[in-house]
């Protein structure tokens, strides 16, 4: 099963101490590079998902190939959301 996540579930579950639920339910998840950047690079040290995402071997970070499709979505969405949608399409994600 291919699962692609955006930043909100990562930070939300990390903030309540239940980041592990993603692994328990899905095994592995895939995130776009922009999601990684939001959660880890720009993430807050406390209350975010920096520690959880960077330490999870079951979270895979993948770069989106179709940059033009991402650019089109940026009129309505932020970069993390746009990359997540395009990555899910590129990988034929189940979730």
Task: Show which residues each predicted segment covers.
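Active-site-proximal, substrate-binding regions of enzyme catalytic domains
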Residues: 1-4, 8-95
